[in-house]
Design a protein with these regions (language model features):
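Glycine-centered tight turns/hairpins at beta-strand boundaries that repeat
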Residues: 1-15, 25, 31-33, 44-58, ...
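Conserved small/polar residues in nucleotide/adenosyl-binding loops
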Residues: 246-247
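A detector of repeated loop/turn-to-beta-strand junctions in beta-rich toroidal repeat architectures
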Residues: 2, 15-17, 38, 58-59, ...
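A short helix->beta-strand "capping" segment at the edge of beta-propeller domains
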Residues: 72-74
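Short glycine-/Asp-/Thr-/Trp-enriched loop segments that recur within the blades
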Residues: 35-41, 80-87, 128-134, 171-177, ...
Length: 247
């Protein structure tokens, strides 16, 4: 929801890459830091129960965030099977999904997908196209991924809980973009590289349609929420600390 979000990690990895902040609608507030600061990580879950995984310099590490303590705290979870950065995630802390990315330090692209049960990661069926810095939306059983790199792509794939299926492409090819959406039938894709003027596209389960653009261009940002109530924050470019609401 656009009135509740959690931001964690990012570049530079020291000292700011461990910072965690909680969004309540009008304001951000600092809460408990990640145990390991990192950038290019994946995430899933909610403001009360989040999941952080992969990234650099700890490409297999998983941490779980819970608000059962005074300010919220991260604890160690099960490691990813495939070390990677630039991956994306979907789902919850106890039913998560990690996909795509690149293996450091050589930046070998991977299509690997892993499912998390709250304790361990299990390898499941791969993406059709290996890529990193891709867009993401959905749950462990109903996810969508789109765009990515290293060369900007418009490719979109739909996850049904078992397999990834290639579906209709984005209208604008891009990488290092953000996404939001409840499942694989409704999602938003916004901003990214190459400079696109902040284009936003809406997914209806079959096709992408251009809708209102973001107020400022940026890339490597984070997106959360649903197709009708999304939040974009962070990233590189103009006003990179500003949160933007889409309704």
């Amino acid at each position: 929801l656009s009135t509740a979000a959690l931001a964690f990690g990012g570049a530079p990895t020291s000292p700011s890459g461990a910072l965690t902040e909680s969004w309540n609608g009008p304001n951000w507030a600092e809460t408990g830091d990640l145990s390991t600061g990192r950038a290019l990580l994946g995430g899933a879950g909610t403001t009360a129960a989040a999941l952080a995984f992969g990234g650099e310099p700890s490409p297999t590490a998983t941490e779980e965030f819970n608000t059962g303590v005074v300010v919220g705290a991260w604890s160690t979870g099960g490691d990813l099977n495939t070390a990677r950065r630039g991956l994306r995630g979907a789902g919850t802390q106890t039913a998560g999904l990690a996909f795509g990315g690149a293996i450091p330090p050589g930046n070998t692209l991977v299509a690997n997908t892993e499912a998390y049960n709250g304790t361990n990661w299990t390898e499941v069926n791969d993406l059709n196209t290996a890529r990193q810095n891709l867009g993401n939306a959905g749950t462990q059983t109903s996810a969508l991924t789109f765009g990515g790199g290293p060369s900007a792509t418009a490719a979109t794939e739909l996850w049904n809980g078992t397999n990834w299926t290639e579906v209709n492409n984005l209208n604008v090819a891009r990488r290092r973009l953000a996404g939001a959406g409840a499942d694989n039938t409704s999602a938003l894709a916004f901003n990214g590289l190459p400079p696109s003027g902040g284009e936003t596209e809406s997914w209806n389960g079959t096709n992408w349609t251009a809708v209102n653009a973001m107020n400022s261009y940026r890339y490597a940002l984070t997106g959360v929420g649903t197709q009708t109530a999304a939040l974009g924050f962070g990233g590189h470019g103009a006003s990179n600390k500003t949160c933007l609401l889409y309704t």
